[in-house]
């Protein structure tokens, strides 16, 4: 949970185990989380092991504010207009729901600061849909059920067994998509299934949606119109809005290199607020916030990584002004997957 968070500061981290709570034997161990070994000598921040830390996205907020503070304290640094927005509901998929581009006049593009190590950069995310399926059974006394009862649980099991068993999260990686059954409950009278589909590729994503529609049609033909389905598209891959605007990507990568970072361009197996902001006319790829082990008791971040984020943001602002004057880096994007 996020109540009573008690941050712990570990200066000059030595790469060894960190006992978050000795009594409850809660330990942050680099043998379990080897990325910690890359943080030796840095100032590590953790929780006390009983809550999450909230790095996602307190680290991003801190980096953005540090950039604003730096620019404010150094008026000699030339830059254009800079807008910063904080969306409190990103983790429940509503962070960009009430984002109004009219509040950000003349903004050409933006960046989210959502997870990732320094150097990570993402402009390719999932397409996403959530699906609900309702199945209607017929209840009859079991002793008189022959030829009459239709058990919704049996129908549900038949539907689930027809889903692709090799296209699930635990068997997917890189640019693979998947089907995921989140919840299924049933009795004889009715059954309900909640699931999601994810895919980077638009055509594969469309095929997954159509597969569900066809499977429902098949089940209805087999059992007599007892299945209803509702498919709600949640968000679209931001690549669709960025692929023809290479400057947005190149500017960030130029700023990374200027900050001494080696860019690590990758696909993001999820979504960000950029998935909701990009369709509103402001293409928004994702940078990083520097944390690790998000959403759990073993979350961490370092002061140095947040500082690096602030440096990158400052360099994006100043580099944008420079390239606007001297010529933009419009090098075409290359597929990296």
Predicted regions and their residues:
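Glycine/charged-rich beta-loop-alpha catalytic/anionic-binding loops adjacent to active sites
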Residues: 37-51, 136-140, 259, 291-295
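Short, hydrophobic beta-strand segments
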Residues: 133-135, 191-199, 231-238
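Acidic-enriched catalytic cores of C-N bond-cleaving enzymes acting on peptides and small amides
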Residues: 123, 145-184, 203-228
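Phosphate/diphosphate-binding glycine-rich loops and adjacent basic-rich segments that engage nucleotide
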Residues: 112-145, 149-154
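Zn-dependent metallopeptidase/amidohydrolase metal-coordination segment
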Residues: 187-189, 262-320, 329
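Acidic/histidine-rich catalytic neighborhood of metal-dependent amide-processing enzymes
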Residues: 37-126, 168-172, 176-178, 182, ...
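Active-site-adjacent substrate-binding region
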Residues: 154-171, 178-180, 226-227, 236-285
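Acidic/His- and Gly-rich active-site-bordering loop/insert found
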Residues: 1-45
